[in-house]
């Protein structure tokens, strides 16, 4: 399968996501520059962390107008899986692909630490390998992760079971003392109603190798890779080279789909150093 990693001016976790997809999980991965109008056959799109366009106006407010986001929206509308991590989550909110908004953290401080997450829903392409109620230990690094939604919208989100991850204590109990940013209903991760678009503030790509202090983030990547590995053929009569887009369209209705592999194309940001330390202020 092929991961498409979006890169905006100011992204600094794209290298981390690429490393997880390609080096840790052995999948094809492709950088998608923000000016591109082509997802290049990606089976899954990741919007990584960072400071897209310097976070001017609001986090993600300018990135939503990038040409690549037009393609991402169309891809998501066809059922293609999209994962927004940290700043990527903020971009999904600004783009209207997920409901709600992000505010400054409670206390107005940047939080960089490991948090515990309780898995709430496992019927998404990004949580299917986890167990309901499982507690994951994954790092965060943000200044604007305080999720907000009006009461009516929040009730609809809860009714539709769109909350997939909540901040919790190490035993999985909800306790405001373990909510690092004041997020409404302790929301750490959210999906759309179709369940193919997911946003989360914690960084699973930073928790895929023991060297980095933990591997609980593998549950997120194991889920999407496992979803695509569960079937390895495009629909009857469809050339394999055309399988990626068709399989993405079918994902929401038929989770057992696999994407076509391919060679890595040169990064549009070649020459940039990897940012393994992650986001520094938001």
Task: Describe the residue ranges of each PLM region.
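N-terminal beta1-alpha1 cap of cysteine-dependent amidohydrolase-like domains
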Residues: 1-85, 93-99, 105-110, 118, ...
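Active-site metal-binding loops of divalent metal-dependent hydrolases
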Residues: 50-51, 88, 143, 204
């Amino acid at each position: 399968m092929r991961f498409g990693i979006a890169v905006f001016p100011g992204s600094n976790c794209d290298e981390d996501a690429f490393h997880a997809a390609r080096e840790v999980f052995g999948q094809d991965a492709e950088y998608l520059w923000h000016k591109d109008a082509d997802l290049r056959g990606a089976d899954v799109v990741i919007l990584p962390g960072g400071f897209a366009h310097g976070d001017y106006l609001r986090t993600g407010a300018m990135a939503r107008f990038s040409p690549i986001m037009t393609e991402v929206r169309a891809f998501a509308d066809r059922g293609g899986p999209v994962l927004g991590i940290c700043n990527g989550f903020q971009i999904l909110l600004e783009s209207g692909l997920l409901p709600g908004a992000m505010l400054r953290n409670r206390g107005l401080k940047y939080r960089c630490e490991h948090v515990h997450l309780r898995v709430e829903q496992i019927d998404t392409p990004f949580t299917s390998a986890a167990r309901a109620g499982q507690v994951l230990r994954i790092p965060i690094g943000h200044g604007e992760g305080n999720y907000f939604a009006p009461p009516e919208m929040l009730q609809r989100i809860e009714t539709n079971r769109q909350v997939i991850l909540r901040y919790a204590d190490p035993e999985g109990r909800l306790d405001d003392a373990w909510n690092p940013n004041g997020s409404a209903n302790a929301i750490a991760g959210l999906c759309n109603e179709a369940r193919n678009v997911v946003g989360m503030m914690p960084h699973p790509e930073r928790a895929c190798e023991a060297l980095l202090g933990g591997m609980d983030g593998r549950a997120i990547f194991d889920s999407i890779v496992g979803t695509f590995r569960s079937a390895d053929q495009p629909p009857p009569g469809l050339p394999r080279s055309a399988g990626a887009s068709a399989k993405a369209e079918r994902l929401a209705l038929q989770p057992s789909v696999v994407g076509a592999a391919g060679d890595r194309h040169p990064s549009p940001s070649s020459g940039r150093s990897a940012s393994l330390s992650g986001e520094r202020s938001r």
